């Protein structure tokens, strides 16, 4: 669709392994040209199959990868299991010898200072590759439709989360009730994500089918922030058959 390549798999495990294989190929190609690869990761259960395969990899030189994560709740305790930094630490960052990992500080008192600090880290050199999902409301990172912008200058900012996004965190089993889910977060912006040379988007389950259809079949618009993937020069979307169920009949 437009410039976006799409692959559909019979199972989410097959989807995750295929995404890992392309990720490995991209990283090795990047490493042939540069010393350090700068990689952004999403913290979500949609990424579990991909991250499991990546954590079991024996071919990538992780000592040449600097890691970032794309969003973080504000106001949760620093040790909360739902914190995205903790999620990724457990899933991948502590399991491989990264050159460096840059965490968004979820307990930052001065939000603007934390945004300035993390933006400085992001802009030290070009961003190379991002692995991400799509939310039930079509968001990428925490760029929900009501606040998403394709043209903002900042690469990270504070955002308020819409209730569809917050309910998704309950649906994923991360929180017991909607009221437990934080209402604000820090998120990398769409221009930051789109600046990456390579984009790998991994979207399993039927709960995402409507968002996938909007992403691929609707207009490129902030009403469905993920639709911007169709404008990237090197983006690949990996779906399982449940996530693709509304587009396979088109």
Residue ranges of predicted features:
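Glycine-rich N-terminal segment of FAD-binding domains in flavoprotein oxidoreductases
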Residues: 28-58
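Class I SAM-dependent methyltransferase SAM-binding "motif I" and its flanking Rossmann-like core
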Residues: 141-188
């Amino acid at each position: 669709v437009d410039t976006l390549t799409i692959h559909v798999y019979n199972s989410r495990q097959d989807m995750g392994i295929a995404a890992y294989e392309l990720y490995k190929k991209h990283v090795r190609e990047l490493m042939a040209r540069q010393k350090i690869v700068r990689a952004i990761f999403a913290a979500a259960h949609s990424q579990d199959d991909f991250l499991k395969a990546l954590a079991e990899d024996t071919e990538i030189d992780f000592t040449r990868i600097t890691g970032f994560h794309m969003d973080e709740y504000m106001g949760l305790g620093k040790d909360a299991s739902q914190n995205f930094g903790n999620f990724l630490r457990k899933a991948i960052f502590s399991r491989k010898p990264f050159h460096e990992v840059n965490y968004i500080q979820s307990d930052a008192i001065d939000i603007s200072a934390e945004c300035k600090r993390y933006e400085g880290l992001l802009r030290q050199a070009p961003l190379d590759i991002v692995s991400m999902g799509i939310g039930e409301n079509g968001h990428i990172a925490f760029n929900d439709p009501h606040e998403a912008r394709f043209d903002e200058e900042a690469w990270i900012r504070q955002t308020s989360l819409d209730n569809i996004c917050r309910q998704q965190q309950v649906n994923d089993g991360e929180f017991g009730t909607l009221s437990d889910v934080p209402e604000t977060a820090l998120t990398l912006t769409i221009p930051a994500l789109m600046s990456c040379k390579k984009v790998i988007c991994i979207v399993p389950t039927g709960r995402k089918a409507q968002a996938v259809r909007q992403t691929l079949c609707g207009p490129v618009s902030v009403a469905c922030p993920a639709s911007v993937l169709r404008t990237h020069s090197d983006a690949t979307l990996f779906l399982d058959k449940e996530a693709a169920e509304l587009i396979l009949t088109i």
